[in-house]
Amino acid sequence: MAVVTMRQLLDAGVHFGHQTRRWNPKMKRYIITERNGIYIIDLQQTLTYIDSAYEFVKETVAHGGNILFVGTKKQAQEAVATEAERVGMPYVNHRWLGGMLTNFQTVHKRLGRLKELQAMDAAENGYEGRTKKEVLMLTRERQKLERVLGGISDMNKVPSAIWIVDTNKEHIAVSEAQKLNIPVVAILDTNCDPDVVDYPIPGNDDAIRSAALLTGVIASAVEDGKKARAERAQAEAKAAAGDNDAPVSSEGESTEVASDAASTASETTATSSDESAAESSEAESK
């Protein structure tokens, strides 16, 4: 079964590119025609690239990796948050902080501060002994951190791969991923540079429905990857249990078997001797 159908892509407007005067010549190979001053993306290629990206994301997650979802433009914010939360992956949908990947240790400290403020806010007497002004300042700090870092609050290491809606807007994220050799999976509109993306999906990154559809596809790949990971872990556990249940020949058991064999041999010899003696006695009496 196809990951997504041609009809779904058409209905979401994935085939609409930018105006012909706003394009990147490197995207020429993904364009099928031009209509009313708008480039039309070849959806047949899009379907092929979707399959490749889907398989990559699925395998990455199946082997224990995580995917960071990034989309800070208004058209992508809701879809990025919704789909990432659906599959339990980190996301950034408001503002990309410089160094979020390349300086992750510092960002991780800020995450610690965020959790500290959240715990303080959740506690019954968390603000006890503080003035109203101090409480207000702490609340504002928490809200600011939640807005920027809330989506990655549970991310303890840099991601295995990154999903991006609009590589031009998220150029800092793309640059940081390249420096750390983190694979980039992204929507490529006709004004984007395909050279900076490892797993491109030619398509419209400006339409809400297009961004939502393609982000949903990547989220589904994550979901399938998690299922494959769970099945693999279950199979390994079952195999390990089978190995433990299998009979193991130990040195002690070998010795015991040898001892039993020796005892049996002795008994046989003794029985033979007794029979011989009886036969001799009978012969003498005759």
Curated annotation (Swiss-Prot):
Entry's Gene Ontology cellular component terms: cytosolic small ribosomal subunit
Residues of the signal peptide: none
Keyword Transferase: no
Gene3D superfamilies tied to this protein: Glucose-6-phosphate isomerase like protein, domain 1 (3.40.50.10490), Helix hairpin bin (1.10.287.610)
GO biological process: translation
Residue spans of biased composition, Low complexity class: 255-280
PROSITE patterns from the UniProt entry: RIBOSOMAL_S2_1
InterPro entries with a match to the protein in the record: Ribosomal_uS2 (IPR001865), Ribosomal_uS2_bac/mit/plastid (IPR005706), Ribosomal_uS2_CS (IPR018130), Ribosomal_uS2_flav_dom_sf (IPR023591)
Entry's Gene Ontology molecular function annotations: structural constituent of ribosome
Protein keywords: Ribonucleoprotein, Ribosomal protein
Claim: Ribonucleoprotein is one of the keywords in the record: yes
Region (Disordered): 231-286
Family: Belongs to the universal ribosomal protein uS2 family.
Family annotation (PANTHER family): 30S RIBOSOMAL PROTEIN S2 PROKARYOTIC AND ORGANELLAR, SMALL RIBOSOMAL SUBUNIT PROTEIN US2M
Identification of the protein by name: Small ribosomal subunit protein uS2
Source organism per UniProt: Corynebacterium kroppenstedtii (strain DSM 44385 / JCM 11950 / CIP 105744 / CCUG 35717)
